[in-house]
Amino acid sequence: ITNKADLYRVLEEAGPVSALINAAAYTDVERAESERDLAFAVNADAAGWAAAWASEQHIPFVHYSTDFVFPDGNHDCWLEGDATSPLNTYGESKRAGELAVRIACPESVIIRTSWVYSEQPGNFVHKVLQLAQSAPSLTMVSDQVGRPTFAPDLAHAALRIAQDAALRLSIQGGLLHFSSGRALSRADFARAIIDIGVTEGVLNHAVPVVDTTSDQFVTAARRPLHCVLDISQAEALGVQLGRWEDSLAISVRAARQ
């Protein structure tokens, strides 16, 4: 995907394409600080090329972005039109991708999302369950606040947008914030995961979660603290499909298999 010719060849070989949804991304927030060129190659350059190809084919293009394009929040929620100011390389590369996509395909729709999890391993839900199986307690930050997003909900939203021209035109500025419900802290999300883990039989007993602050952890990348996306536009357009409280059990049950 970091080679334009190869990317175009793969897209051409895919046969007739009615829409293109770009879910490819470099998402390792920590490693991006030392792999800046690769992060920008995937999140910015490749995104722009994919958008340009879609524009050339005259087909809809939907692109995923992130809440990390914003800094620490100083109000309740970030609106789509609020000024961006990323705090780390990952966020900078995703913001550059937004700009590249918009230039290459002005009719594109960019979906910003946050805290994505699914049934697949490697996300926050499964990491919490793994730690809770062996640790007497977990220490989690309580000053990082956001909205969890169930990956299938996000995929359904993107597919619907790609298929519905009227809906795309209704999205203001081609920017949409999407997640699966209410905001909470990382610590509280971990507690919810553990509670459901016990209910679903993935965990034998509940493990206490101890609150801490982000400054107690040494990390290469700085994370925004209160970074909550305003999803009122998605709700008004009827794009929202569900709540993370309802879908979290699906992800937790998958860890049992």
Explain the meaning of each model-derived region:
Residues 11, 158-162, 193, 231, ...:
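Hydrophobic "lid"/C-terminal helical patch
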Residues 1-42:
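NAD(P)H-binding glycine-rich loop region in Rossmannoid oxidoreductase-like domains
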Residues 99-160:
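NAD(P)-dependent short-chain dehydrogenase/reductase
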Residues 8, 34-62:
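NAD(P)-cofactor binding segment of oxidoreductase domains
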Residues 157, 164-219:
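Mid/C-terminal beta-alpha module of Rossmann-like enzyme folds, strongest
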Residues 34, 41, 45-49, 69-111, ...:
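Catalytic helix-loop patch of NAD(P)-dependent Rossmann-fold dehydrogenases
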Residues 242-257:
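Amphipathic terminal alpha-helices
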Residues 20-24, 61-66, 71, 111-113:
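SDR active-site strand-loop-helix element
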